[in-house]
C-alpha cells in the first residue's frame, strides 16, 4: 500500500487494528529480507511486545516498513 492509503486509513483505525497491521508488515519484511522477526522489530524501533508501543511509535514504524516494502 502506498503512503496516501496509509494516510487515509490510519486515522480511522483503532490501536488494535494498527497492531495487527504492524504484525502483517513484519511478516512481509521478515520474508523479503530473510531476517529474524526480532531483528526486524529492532530495526524499526519496536518493542519485543508490539502491544507495548505507543500508537505514534506503531504508526512511525508502519510508514518506515511500508516505504521499505514499496521500494522492492
Q: For each predicted feature, which ranges?
A:
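Short amphipathic alpha-helical interaction elements located at domain edges
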Residues: 1-72
Amino acid at each position: 500500500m502506498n503512503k496516501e492509503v496509509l494516510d487515509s486509513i490510519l486515522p480511522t483505525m483503532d490501536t488494535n487494528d494498527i497492531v495487527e497491521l504492524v504484525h502483517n508488515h513484519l511478516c512481509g519484511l521478515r520474508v523479503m529480507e530473510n531476517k529474524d522477526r526480532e531483528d526486524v522489530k529492532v530495526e524499526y524501533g519496536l518493542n519485543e511486545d508490539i502491544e507495548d508501543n505507543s500508537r505514534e511509535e506503531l504508526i512511525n514504524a508502519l510508514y518506515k516498513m511500508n516505504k521499505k516494502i514499496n521500494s522492492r
